[in-house]
Regions:
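A generic structural signal for short beta-strands and their flanking turns/coil linkers
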Residues: 56, 83-85
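A structural signal for the main folded, soluble domain(s) of proteins
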Residues: 57-61, 74-77
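Short secondary-structure junction motifs
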Residues: 55-57, 115
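Acidic helix-start/capping segments at beta-turn-to-alpha-helix junctions
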Residues: 59-69
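Charged, often glycine-rich, active-site loop that binds/positions anionic groups
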Residues: 50, 68-83
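Catalytic cores and adjacent binding grooves of peptidoglycan-active enzymes
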Residues: 78, 83, 91-150
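Active-site acidic/histidine clusters and adjacent loop/turn architecture
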Residues: 1-45, 49-55
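The substrate-binding groove and active-site-proximal loops of carbohydrate-active enzymes
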Residues: 16-19, 86, 90
Length: 150
């Protein structure tokens, strides 16, 4: 847990509506995990000398945020995190972030389902993919390598 989550965890409880939004979001994240491992497990195993048998997880830095947590982390007042519609996906570098984004675009195209936001964001210390899916009125907003202070 981060310092922010420890300080604010008590009030960071999603409602039933938020949980439904999180379930919708996790379907996409599970498809991302499966496709990531299908496409890149062999490459990773070759780099590790063929000793690879465990699939890589998708690591989520942030999903639902209460208004208090969102404010504490400097989130936008209209953030999709406030409704449980967004997740920030940890990336090991720009290459992984771009590959995650490509997979999510492919999933959207193949399923003919839209997402709201697909953003690659970075700060001085890290890079992540911000991905959001709303129940309706998804905008398919794509933006790569946005700088976030912090």
């Amino acid at each position: 847990m981060t310092k922010t989550s420890v300080k604010t965890a008590d009030g960071n409880i999603p409602s039933h509506v938020h949980i439904e939004n999180l379930k919708r979001l996790t379907k996409w994240l599970e498809m991302l995990r499966e496709e990531w491992n299908r496409r890149y497990a062999d490459v990773r195993c070759q780099k590790e000398g063929g000793r690879c048998s465990i699939e890589e997880p998708i690591i989520i830095n942030s999903a639902y945020r209460s208004p208090q947590v969102n404010k504490a982390v400097g989130g936008a007042p209209t953030s999709n995190h406030l409704t449980g519609c967004a997740a920030d996906i940890h990336c090991l570098g720009k290459e992984q972030a771009i590959r995650y984004a490509c997979i999510l675009l492919d999933i959207s195209d193949e399923s003919q389902e839209d997402f709201d936001e697909l953003l690659i964001e970075q700060s001085a210390k890290s890079i992540w993919v911000h991905f959001a899916v709303r129940p309706s009125e998804n905008r398919r907003r794509v933006d790569f390598l946005r700088w976030r202070p912090g």
